[in-house]
């Protein structure tokens, strides 16, 4: 997709795209800006695979795939994976890394709304990780994800809660004190309360199945899933 087509799409934040374009070459640097994504990927993958009853042989869509960290890991589990993103550079990095790794992933520069118009009801599993807070209309993304999954299929979302603690942890702590992610990565005004996300889900054919928090311990420098959704959280939904 060229720049002209990108500008035509309404549900794209060009400043957000530019942020990730600027650091795309370091997406697979395990000690770089995306180190936290590499660290939490096994937790995400395990949660998705367990809640979906395994990924082997399933058709999976990763919305907002970036450089392909989660998409590749799901393909390694035996899934047929398509990765969507609107960033040209991250997709180029994802394609090259998949080629070097011998992993088959179909990467497409397209919005989820455009993809839903052509591929409704075609996926067993849809994942949308840390993407909703980077678009102007996150509800539109939720709606499109619901359209893309098969009846009985699974849709997973992850995002950041909007409150004082999440601002302190995800912005002040992660960006300015611990420097885990680049400054300016997050805008607390775009964070999404669980009740808001569940409200959008309720307006689709999806049904909530499970919600869990993703927690970081700065003392042990480790991540874990568990109760409490006051900062990062993941939501498992299923199509009716």
From Swiss-Prot:
Quickly give the catalysed reaction: a 3-demethylubiquinol + S-adenosyl-L-methionine = a ubiquinol + S-adenosyl-L-homocysteine + H(+); a 3-(all-trans-polyprenyl)benzene-1,2-diol + S-adenosyl-L-methionine = a 2-methoxy-6-(all-trans-polyprenyl)phenol + S-adenosyl-L-homocysteine + H(+)
Q: Does the keyword Transmembrane helix apply?
A: no
Pathway it belongs to? Cofactor biosynthesis; ubiquinone biosynthesis
Name a GO molecular-function annotation. Answer: 3-demethylubiquinol 3-O-methyltransferase activity
Residues that, per the record, bind S-adenosyl-L-methionine? 44, 64, 85, 129
UniProt EC number:
2.1.1.222, 2.1.1.64
- Annotated Pfam families: Methyltransf_23 (PF13489)
The alphabetized list of GO BP terms reads: methylation
Q: Which InterPro entries match?
A: SAM-dependent_MTases_sf, UbiG_MeTrfase
Alphabetically list the UniProt keywords. Methyltransferase, S-adenosyl-L-methionine, Transferase, Ubiquinone biosynthesis
Similarity remark: Belongs to the methyltransferase superfamily. UbiG/COQ3 family.
Q: Which NCBIfam families match?
A: UbiG (TIGR01983)
| Chain's role | O-methyltransferase that catalyzes the 2 O-methylation steps in the ubiquinone biosynthetic pathway.
Entry-linked HAMAP family: UbiG
What protein does this entry describe? Ubiquinone biosynthesis O-methyltransferase
